[in-house]
């Protein structure tokens, strides 16, 4: 009932490792299995993980990661220099729904952007001044994720790509000037 690491997880890790600085205070939103956070631990000042799933939260704790069970980063008052998120970015069709926590980990809502919008709307609250975020998105998302980023006054740069059979995944670095 936890999202298992896949190509998108690897893409986030690669982009995070290129961006990471030793003095970064990092939050990984929706950390799931802890694949990324586990590999960043010890390479930065601190790392906090969040996940909405109690099963993911238990797994993150089991791996020795600091975790807050919450939706995105609700209730967290600290701001972070590096924010990471591999969101659910696909629209899960009704016949594929299982009615469990894995649905929450995979289903990005209509056109795959519901959770991405929620994340972008909360980014000012969790990203420090001169902070950066790395977001994973799909070429299948509508409206275009780049437009959603622009509409919220952020700047962005594609810092990684991965072509799959039916879509292209992007690692997008986001910041404010």
Swiss-Prot record:
Keyword flag Transit peptide: no
Name one process (GO BP) from the record. Answer: methylation
Q: Catalyzes what?
A: L-glutaminyl-[protein] + S-adenosyl-L-methionine = N(5)-methyl-L-glutaminyl-[protein] + S-adenosyl-L-homocysteine + H(+)
Q: Which residues bind substrate?
A: 86-89
Q: Which residues bind S-adenosyl-L-methionine?
A: 30-34, 51, 86
Give the UniProt family note: Belongs to the eukaryotic/archaeal PrmC-related family.
NCBIfam families, alphabetized: hemK_rel_arch
Q: What is this protein called?
A: Putative protein N5-glutamine methyltransferase AF_1784
- Report the source organism: Archaeoglobus fulgidus (strain ATCC 49558 / DSM 4304 / JCM 9628 / NBRC 100126 / VC-16)
């Amino acid at each position: 009932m936890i999202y298992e690491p896949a190509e998108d997880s690897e893409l986030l890790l690669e982009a995070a490792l290129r961006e990471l600085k030793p003095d970064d205070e990092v939050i990984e939103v929706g950390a799931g299995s802890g694949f990324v956070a586990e590999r960043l631990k010890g390479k930065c000042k601190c790392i906090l993980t969040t996940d909405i799933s109690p099963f993911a939260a238990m797994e993150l704790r089991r791996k020795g990661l600091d975790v807050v069970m919450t939706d995105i980063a609700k209730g967290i008052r600290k701001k972070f220099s590096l924010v990471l998120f591999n969101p659910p970015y696909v629209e899960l069709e009704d016949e594929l729904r299982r009615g469990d926590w894995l649905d929450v980990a995979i289903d990005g809502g209509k056109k795959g952007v519901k959770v991405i919008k929620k994340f972008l709307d909360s980014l000012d609250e969790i990203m420090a001044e001169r902070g950066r975020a790395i977001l994973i998105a799909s070429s299948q998302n509508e409206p275009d994720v780049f437009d959603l980023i622009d509409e919220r006054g952020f700047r962005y740069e594609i810092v990684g790509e991965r072509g799959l059979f039916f879509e292209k995944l992007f690692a997008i670095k986001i910041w404010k000037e």
